[in-house]
Swiss-Prot record:
It comes from Anaplasma marginale. Its cofactor is Mg(2+). InterPro entries: PPase-energised_H-pump (IPR004131). It is found in: Cell inner membrane. It is a multi-pass membrane protein. Its main location: membrane. GO terms for molecular function: diphosphate hydrolysis-driven proton transmembrane transporter activity; inorganic diphosphate phosphatase activity. Proton pump that utilizes the energy of pyrophosphate hydrolysis as the driving force for proton movement across the membrane. Generates a proton motive force. The chain crosses the membrane at residues 11-31, 46-66, 121-141. Its EC number is 7.1.3.1. This is Pyrophosphate-energized proton pump.
Length: 141
């Protein structure tokens, strides 16, 4: 349909799928899928590390979707700022500030959820794996 966001989403999905395959291959070649050690009495497996990478990719995808919602010209946040412009500068500034404060909540919740989930799975190393997966797909975005 000629939409730039459609092209971005197609590229993001393709990059995500290739990243999942790459994560699986790298995991198989480096640590395998079984237990690789213990941290603080908790067993860490290759599967845990793979899931941490998947969580990183999911967090990146969610942030893209949330960002598109808050910046899309046909979505409520942008339309509310445009509507506030009709009544004057003051209401425009107030509405813009309100939307900007609102727009930071969901990405923060998604990132914190990703950190908690990866830390529970594999400690700080699991969080590092997730962040590396996020950086691996960032080039597409």
């Amino acid at each position: 349909n000629g939409s730039i966001m459609g092209a971005l989403y197609k590229g993001l999905i393709a990059t995500g799928l290739l990243s999942i395959v790459g994560l699986g291959v790298a995991n198989t070649l480096t640590v395998g899928w079984g237990e690789i050690g213990t941290v603080a009495g908790k067993s860490i497996t290759g599967t845990n590390l793979f899931v941490c990478g998947l969580i990183g990719l999911i967090v990146t995808g969610l942030i893209v979707v949330i960002t598109e919602y808050y910046t899309g010209t046909n979505k409520r946040p942008v339309n509310s700022x445009a509507q506030a412009s009709v009544t004057g500068h003051g209401t425009n500034v107030i509405q813009g500030l309100a939307v900007s404060l609102e727009s930071t909540a969901l990405p923060a919740i998604v990132i914190v959820g990703g950190i908690i989930x990866t830390y529970q799975l594999a400690g700080l190393f699991g969080t590092a794996i997730a962040v590396t997966a996020m950086l691996g797909i960032a080039g597409m975005i």
